[in-house]
């Protein structure tokens, strides 16, 4: 009996020691912000502050900004997140100290071959990709892609006309998402698809599988809580991206590169062709060695991942904003009609020269920054503007907060394209307007994305006006998704411009 009691006591002591050690491990970094006097929500052991993300990143960040001010601290598990909103500090992180300290993005999950993509690559590997890929987005290459994108604009118009003739309202994200998917796949892989009418196309199915992501997926959450698991997952070939879809695109890239290397014929310009050509045009062939087929596959998939959701969502938010502001919609249509009389086909130069279209799109990007946040990992201990940031920490720049701050934007919740007029845009601080980031690691595909969206808007607004209907949610409520989305799908009435326009 005494032995049993002794063993029980030893067991209890051992359990107590284990629990104390676990608690200390799960909270070992949680005193960092308190030491510096940086406010923030109280973290939980192991979890940190991640449970607050259930509110939606944009909403949680707004609550923190209102409660704590310009700088606050969060924890993804045990990883400290320094959230900054001061423009000068943001400039230091994104530009001045980009190469020396804040080069890389945060690892959210094991990514497999996608670590070879420009968005997820690190340090010298990222610099090499950037040097090789930047020339693919020149205005000359975009002009060559323009007719390909325009043909999908025509398909979009044809589909919307059919829907308008039925007299039924349209779920715009479904339609504009199909347009975005067609453009991304066609300009990346040189393949013509029609996902509006062929949603079971294997390219479409595999692309959509790649796009599925949930921060609270057990795999993502386990990495947030226990970062040391990432290399273990990588060794075990466990990846957030579906293996069958990765293999589908890899096989296609392999076939494509073989065919093009064997053929002497001139090929249609697409991103895979341009990536193959990038090495031949590189001035520094020693450091900028050619992209391997794995690397080309990774870039191709990241183009889909980065381009589809952002383009379709921004276009959806834009037509919603136009439908709920008919005076702005009319003014934009007048600019389009003046530049392109009698529904003349647009040209690259005409599209990029439209000032009011640019203003409307910029204001949509301000109101609805799809990614909510920018983030950079600190590579070494550093002090910026009085804030000590230790190696391994992450700096968060809350784009949504900056874009909705009344200190920078009077009446920030109002849709006012005039903010970006010639007279006004010079007064905008470039570090409080960050739809595509800033600095050397900004969005490499920004010019392509803007051209794509502008062309789609011109095509549809030449032919239609958008109106609210009884299914339209006004005001628009945003969901808790990781990427900015409405709670309910945006549904609008599409009215051909040669028809009589009536009230909703």
From Swiss-Prot:
Which factors induce or repress this protein, as stated in its UniProt record? P450 can be induced to high levels in liver and other tissues by various foreign compounds, including drugs, pesticides, and carcinogens.
Give the residues the record marks as binding heme.
443
Membrane topology qualifier: Peripheral membrane protein
- Cell compartments where the protein resides: Endoplasmic reticulum membrane; Microsome membrane
**A GO CC annotation given for this chain:** endoplasmic reticulum membrane
Known catalytic reactions: an organic molecule + reduced [NADPH--hemoprotein reductase] + O2 = an alcohol + oxidized [NADPH--hemoprotein reductase] + H2O + H(+)
A Pfam entry, by short name:
p450
Question: Known InterPro entries for this protein?
Answer: Cyt_P450, Cyt_P450_CS, Cyt_P450_E_CYP3A, Cyt_P450_E_grp-II, Cyt_P450_sf, Cytochrome_P450_3A
UniProt EC number = 1.14.14.1
Keywords noted in UniProt: Endoplasmic reticulum, Heme, Iron, Membrane, Metal-binding, Microsome, Monooxygenase, Oxidoreductase
Q: Answer whether the UniProt record assigns the keyword Heme to this protein.
A: yes
Principal localisation: endoplasmic reticulum
Q: Name one GO molecular function term.
A: iron ion binding
Q: What cofactor does its activity depend on?
A: heme
Q: For this UniProt entry, which residues form the secretion signal? A: none
**Functional summary from the UniProt entry:** Cytochromes P450 are a group of heme-thiolate monooxygenases. In liver microsomes, this enzyme is involved in an NADPH-dependent electron transport pathway. It oxidizes a variety of structurally unrelated compounds, including steroids, fatty acids, and xenobiotics.
According to its UniProt record, which protein family does this protein belong to? Belongs to the cytochrome P450 family.
User: What is the protein named?
Assistant: Cytochrome P450 3A16
Name the source organism: Mus musculus
**Gene that codes for this?**
Cyp3a16
